């Protein structure tokens, strides 16, 4: 087990460049071209939103803490960099990822209990056989090369709270943004500390509009606030004098300028979150469920 991120398998094996990640998905798509054409799926970000919402439903039924849920989201993301979605039953994959994450995060759940709750949520897609979860668990572990320890941005957020004098409201908003980043590719593209700094910046820069953003990710008012605020962040970094900048924002900008953190990466992450919230406005749970269910049933992946 790696005690720190920089010596971890997460840093060494599960951090991609954008082009590298796009190429990996293209290779998977080319190999499954007939099925992709036959069974269209929504935008990957919409698919991620749907999977995330199903995971949240399962976690609530079992009263599992956020970190285990986040680890499950990471497992699903990693798995789907190696396996094309249409080769799988996403309901079984997310159930198995959740079961495995609970073990790794030291809040284990009995396999039959997880199976029972999953069947309660998706009876038409989860077979009444716990061996299916066991088989899928082996598949996940194999595709992830047994590299199961995940470092999350929450720790950095907690460490910076007192140093940057963050209020409880700012911490709550930053936490919410971190939760939402698991719906994007950011967890495969940037280290956790960059994600945490991005979330802090959003929380502080958007403070006048935070009731819009924290209410829930993806609302149109939140999207507008974030879009406007991303311009504020760019202005903050480009303003060398700090004129007209709130004191806390200036302090964070100064701290960041004197750190080793990649400012361009923080800005890029902010733009990805804005993009997520824009896409979220198009989300329809009904459409996603129908499209996923169609290929799962047609290919017999629910058996």
UniProtKB/Swiss-Prot annotation:
Kindly list the biological process annotations in GO that this record carries: regulation of transcription by RNA polymerase II
Sorted alphabetically, which keywords does the UniProt record give? Activator, Cyclin, Nucleus, Repressor, Transcription, Transcription regulation
- Superkingdom of this entry's organism? Eukaryota
Domain Cyclin N-terminal, first and last residues per copy? 55-113
Q: Name the SUPFAM superfamilies on file.
A: Cyclin-like
Predominant location: nucleus
> How far does the signal peptide extend, from start to end residue?
none
> Which InterPro entries does this UniProt record tie to the protein?
Cyclin-like_dom (IPR013763), Cyclin-like_sf (IPR036915), Cyclin/Ssn8 (IPR043198), Cyclin_N (IPR006671)
Q: Which Gene Ontology terms cover its molecular function?
A: cyclin-dependent protein serine/threonine kinase regulator activity
Q: Does this entry carry the keyword Protein biosynthesis?
A: no
**GO cellular component terms given for this protein:** nucleus
* Protein's cellular compartments: Nucleus
Quaternary structure and partners:
Component of the SRB8-11 complex, a regulatory module of the Mediator complex.
| Family per record | Belongs to the cyclin family. Cyclin C subfamily.
Read off the PANTHER family from this record.
Answer: CYCLIN
Its biological purpose: Component of the SRB8-11 complex. The SRB8-11 complex is a regulatory module of the Mediator complex which is itself involved in regulation of basal and activated RNA polymerase II-dependent transcription. The SRB8-11 complex may be involved in the transcriptional repression of a subset of genes regulated by Mediator. It may inhibit the association of the Mediator complex with RNA polymerase II to form the holoenzyme complex. The SRB8-11 complex phosphorylates the C-terminal domain (CTD) of the largest subunit of RNA polymerase II.
Protein's UniProt name = RNA polymerase II holoenzyme cyclin-like subunit
Q: Which organism is it from?
A: Coccidioides immitis (strain RS) (Valley fever fungus)
């Amino acid at each position: 087990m790696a005690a720190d991120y920089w010596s971890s398998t997460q840093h060494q094996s599960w951090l991609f460049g954008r082009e590298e990640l796009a190429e990996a998905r293209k290779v998977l798509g080319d190999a499954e071209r007939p099925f992709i054409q036959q069974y269209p799926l929504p935008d990957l970000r919409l698919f991620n939103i749907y999977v995330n919402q199903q995971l949240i439903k399962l976690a609530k039924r079992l009263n599992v803490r956020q970190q285990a849920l986040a680890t499950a989201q990471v497992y699903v993301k990693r798995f789907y960099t190696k396996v094309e979605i249409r080769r799988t039953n996403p309901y079984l994959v997310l159930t198995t990822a959740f079961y495995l994450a609970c073990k790794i995060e030291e809040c284990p759940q009995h396999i039959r209990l997880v199976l029972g709750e999953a069947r309660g949520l998706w009876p038409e897609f989860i077979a009444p056989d716990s061996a299916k979860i066991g088989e899928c668990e082996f598949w996940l572990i194999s595709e992830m090369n047994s590299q199961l320890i995940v470092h999350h941005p929450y720790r950095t957020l907690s460490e910076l709270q007192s140093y940057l004098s963050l209020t409880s409201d700012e911490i709550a908003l930053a936490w919410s943004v971190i939760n939402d980043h698991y719906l994007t590719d950011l967890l495969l593209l940037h280290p956790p500390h960059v994600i945490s700094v991005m979330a802090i910046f959003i929380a502080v820069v958007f403070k006048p509009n935070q009731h819009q953003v924290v209410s829930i990710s993806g609302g149109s008012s939140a999207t507008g606030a974030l879009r406007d605020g991303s311009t504020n962040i760019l202005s903050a970094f480009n303003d060398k004098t700090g004129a007209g900048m709130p004191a806390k924002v200036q302090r964070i900008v100064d701290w960041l300028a004197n750190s080793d953190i990649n400012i361009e990466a923080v800005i890029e992450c902010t733009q990805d979150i804005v993009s997520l919230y824009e896409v979220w406005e198009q989300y329809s749970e009904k459409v996603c469920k129908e499209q996923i269910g169609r290929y799962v049933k047609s290919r017999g992946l629910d058996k």
